[in-house]
Amino acid sequence: MARRSILLSQRLLLMDKFNSIADAIDCGASMTEQATGRLMDVDGGTCALGAAMVAVDLTPITANLPLLVKRFPQPMPMICPICDGEMPRSSHYKHLALLVHLNDFHAMPREQIAHWIRSQLS
């Protein structure tokens, strides 16, 4: 139990290095190839969300998505920049779900996803 607490403390410190989830995506994207359909593939490739997780030393096994949401809050739903107006019912996403949608459905490069997030948060 103490080891788990130490690991959580280390991950929180890693998360504090990043001002936004976009920064974490950029960092993780620089360490891995892009993957779709899963957080991390068998070759170590990651989706946008997986890249952010790699940056803070999380894996699909140690994933703590509530911790990511708490550290990188998104106060309102975001609208998919590609689906907007085309599919109104499915173009509204909350926080981390939009990262998965842009990565998997639109095959948007992770760095472009990070750039778009920054443009929405500024």
Predicted features, each with a name:
Residues M1-T46, M53-S122:
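Domain-length accessory/inserted modules outside core catalytic folds
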